Amino acid sequence: MKVEYHKHWSINLNREIEYKTYGESGRGVLVFPSQDQRFYEWEDNGMMDILAPMIEAGEIHLICCDSIDAETWSLTSGDYNERISLHERWFNYIVDELIPEVSHGEKLIASGCSMGGYHAGNFFFRHPELFSGVVSLSGLFHADYFFPNYDNELIYRNSPLDFLPNATPMTADRYRGKTLIFCCGQGNYERVTGASTGKLHGILERLGVDSWFDLWGKDVSHDFYWWRRQAQYFFGKIAEGAWRRAA
């Protein structure tokens, strides 16, 4: 497969930031790393090996972006407003700088595991016009986990379990007709993410948004051993057209 490394200057972040691409045809997938991890996380943990047949067949191509979670979501001793403001600058970098550079006008699928699964969902729900869908594995969708007892509008805007119940019919309609896949195990370290995923399922059902929520077994833990299998399964379904929605 064609693999390319990129480093560019972000106006929003006022720093250089990196990303890597895998493949060059098929449906584009924007991959967010898990908590505090980097753009090379999926490659280091065997995800590219699992997805290589689909990438080499031109069914999907991946753009793996970088994150700054360690300075924002994970910096629990920091000031709430400073942390979420920096996160929003990174969010704007993805929307205003990275996506225009890599999408070539295509609506991408947002994806990730754990914190990356949260980011994938958050980007999709805030900007559905940029995405054809989301594949979120073991995501946590409530900002209160990282910002306990928050009282901040910007944090609210980054907390899908809080803002989605207030979605207007027009907003909910923007989510329809897309590929929405959310998966979580029921094994070790999946209790909190499983509960969060279940709440998200209920909200989307009440909004009348068609989606696929798949809870795997009690032996399925919060790690790449299972995320590799889940990614292979769900992206395989997308490649086959078994779960495909027009953007």
Regions found by a protein language model. Give the residues of each.
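Non-catalytic cap/lid and distal C-terminal segments of serine-dependent acyl enzymes
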Residues: M1-A247
